A protein has these predicted regions:
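Domain-level signature for soluble enzymes in the chorismate/prephenate branch of the shikimate pathway
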Residues: 1-148
Length: 148
C-alpha cells in the first residue's frame, strides 16, 4: 500500500506565514486550524488538496527545503541570502519587504575611508561580510547579534 504524497510547505513563523495563508485563501486554499491563535501545533494539513504546512523559525526554512523535509519554503530574501543554502528562488511574492542599512558613529566613516578594520554587529553576519568585502573592499570583524 503506497502512502499518499502531500505537497509540503515550510513557513517562517509570524507575519510571513499569515501573509502566505492570506495569499492561499485568495486562490481558494484554506487551512482553518492555522487560524486558531491559541493552537500550539506546528504542522497543519489540508486534506482536500493534499497540502501540509509546517511552521518553523525562518532561518531553518531553507535548510528544510534543501534537505527535502519541505517541497517549498516561504521566507524573506534576507533569510535566503543569509543562510546561503542550495535552494532555488522560484518567485518573489512581493510582501515582507525589509531594508538593511549601515549606521554607526561618525568616526567609523574615517576608518572606512582608510580601509581600516572595523567591528560590525549584525543579525546577518554573512550578508554584512559580503557587503563590506565586495562592495566596500573592507575587512571587518563581525559580531553576530540576534536583533531586538
Amino acid at each position: 500500500m503506497s502512502e499518499e504524497r502531500y505537497l509540503t510547505f515550510a513557513l517562517g513563523k509570524g507575519r510571513l506565514a499569515k501573509k502566505t495563508l492570506d495569499l492561499f485563501e485568495q486562490i481558494g486554499i484554506t487551512c482553518d486550524e492555522m487560524k486558531d491563535k491559541d493552537t500550539r501545533k506546528l504542522i497543519f494539513v489540508n486534506e482536500e488538496y493534499k497540502l501540509r504546512f509546517f511552521l518553523a523559525k525562518s532561518p531553518d526554512v531553507p535548510t528544510y527545503v534543501e534537505y527535502g523535509a519541505a517541497d517549498i519554503g516561504v521566507v524573506g530574501k534576507d533569510t535566503i541570502l543569509e543562510e546561503n543554502r542550495n535552494v532555488y528562488e522560484v518567485l518573489d511574492l512581493g510582501f515582507g519587504k525589509c531594508r538593511m542599512c549601515v549606521c554607526g558613529p561618525a568616526s567609523a566613516g574615517e576608518l572606512l575611508k582608510h580601509h581600516e578594520r572595523i567591528r560590525v554587529a549584525s543579525k546577518y553576519p554573512n550578508i554584512a561580510r559580503e557587503y563590506f568585502y565586495n562592495k566596500k573592499h573592507q575587512t571587518v570583524e563581525i559580531i553576530k547579534l540576534n536583533g531586538s
